[in-house]
């Protein structure tokens, strides 16, 4: 813990910093508490913090906090001049064949041109992907799920729009290397999206769409070695793809 008091005729400020390491993680906070004549009779200050923890079963928890007592404090005291404050907590696990991450983010605007209740201040994300290798079909299969939402505190039409989305995706990938050295990559997939929209009369409350896709890519990698020891690489690529969005 580090405490640094500062006293003058116009302000009384206590700066503080706290850091601690644990067996599975670490945290760090810094901030200040102020009483000054810019806003008489009011407590002012800021708090920034971050941390990371390695949890059981390969999970990792990260967090970041940024908050101030008022929009002008950082500028008044020569601190980093953020136009938006971002706080986040996230949980993730990355393994060889699976990837998972979920997070919640909160934004606080410091811009004079923005109203706090009209920005998407609360944001939730969830991502999950799994891959496996089917024996009979060959290649690689990927299955994914994505969820997202952002909300505004305003209930006004259009400017207070809130959106939630969920996506399910499946994809098959396979490659062949022919005797000539030509490589062929095939990609087949499809996704399904559903949207929930509130406080916006320009859109329906529910939208669902599907998006199949296919692609064939041909590559012909070539190398040439120079007498100087340099190696040149050339890889012509041709691709044809197709997709269709249906509501």
Model-predicted segments: where are they?
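Outer-membrane beta-barrel proteins and related beta-barrel translocases across Gram-negative bacteria
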Residues: 1-247
């Amino acid at each position: 813990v580090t405490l640094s008091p500062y006293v003058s005729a116009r302000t009384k400020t206590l700066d503080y910093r706290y850091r601690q390491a644990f067996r599975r993680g670490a945290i760090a906070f810094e901030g200040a508490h102020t009483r000054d004549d810019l806003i008489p009779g009011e407590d002012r200050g800021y708090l920034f913090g971050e941390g990371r923890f390695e949890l059981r079963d390969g999970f990792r928890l990260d967090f970041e906090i940024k908050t101030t007592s008022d929009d002008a404090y950082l500028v008044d005291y020569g601190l980093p001049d953020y136009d938006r404050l971002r706080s986040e907590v996230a949980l993730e696990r990355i393994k060889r064949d699976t990837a998972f991450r979920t997070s919640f983010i909160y934004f606080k605007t410091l811009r004079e041109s923005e109203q706090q209740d009209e920005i998407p201040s609360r944001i939730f994300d969830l991502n999950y992907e799994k891959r496996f290798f089917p024996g009979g079909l060959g290649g690689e299969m990927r299955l994914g799920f994505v969820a997202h939402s952002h909300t505004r505190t305003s209930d006004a039409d259009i400017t207070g729009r809130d959106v939630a989305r969920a996506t399910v995706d499946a994809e098959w990938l396979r490659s062949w290397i022919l005797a000539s050295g030509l490589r062929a990559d095939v990609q087949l997939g499809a996704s399904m999206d559903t949207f929930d929209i509130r406080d916006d009369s320009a859109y329906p409350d529910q939208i669902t769409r599907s998006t199949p896709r296919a692609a064939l890519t041909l590559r012909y990698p070539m190398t040439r070695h120079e007498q100087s020891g340099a190696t040149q690489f050339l890889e012509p690529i041709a691709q044809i793809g197709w997709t269709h969005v249906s509501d």
